[in-house]
Amino acid sequence: MIISETNRREISKYLFKEGVLFAKKDFNLPQHPLIESVPNLQVIKLMQSFKSKEYVRETFAWMHYYWFLTNEGIDFLRTYLNLPSEIVPATLKKQQKPLGRPFGGGGDRPRGPPRGDGERRFGDRDGYRGGPKSGGEYGDKAGAPADYQPGFRGGAGGARQGFGRGAGGFGGGAAGSDLP
């Protein structure tokens, strides 16, 4: 596809500045949402070209293309756009850490009462927490006593008792069969 030099430069500038680019998979979209006056189709086609040259890495999810600039792509765009080596994409810049406390501080909401020594924060939930439990409704959960003898108190009342198909329950079956 023939892409004008101005559109190619606009796409390349945006890609180098941000380090990433996305486009909706809509070839009829008249303009890309982030790059002014460039059709969405031209963005997709230029990125396909960059992908084949391994300048970008492509991911597709939820009807959107996502392209991430590679090191080779950074070198290519730096020479194409005549940029010095001090300028780097936004994805390679270290983010500034905010000054101040990380988890709140100040704010409109009043803080709760201070906790005493050893006091649990969520005392109403202690029943759900682990630890030693009392006997309760179902007894101790430690296990069966040592002298416990389990037994089967089955019920077909007569002949041979068993499990599954050999039980001889409904209709006689194989165990108590009177058939010749």
UniProtKB/Swiss-Prot annotation:
Region (Disordered) residue spans: 92-180
Q: Where is the composition biased (Gly residues)?
A: 152-180
Going by the UniProt record, its keywords in alphabetical order are: Cytoplasm, Ribonucleoprotein, Ribosomal protein
Indicate where this protein resides in the cell: Cytoplasm
Q: Where does this protein chiefly localize?
A: cytoplasm
Example GO BP: axillary shoot meristem initiation
Composition bias of kind Basic and acidic residues appears in: 108-128
- Coiled-coil intervals, chain numbering: none
**Entry's Gene Ontology molecular function annotations:** mRNA binding; structural constituent of ribosome
Q: Which GO terms describe its cellular component?
A: chloroplast; cytosolic ribosome; cytosolic small ribosomal subunit; plant-type cell wall; plastid
Task: Report the superkingdom from the record.
Answer: Eukaryota
The family assignment reads:
Belongs to the eukaryotic ribosomal protein eS10 family.
Matching entries from PANTHER family are given as: 40S RIBOSOMAL PROTEIN S10, SMALL RIBOSOMAL SUBUNIT PROTEIN ES10Y
Its recorded name reads: Small ribosomal subunit protein eS10y
Protein's organism:
Arabidopsis thaliana (Mouse-ear cress)
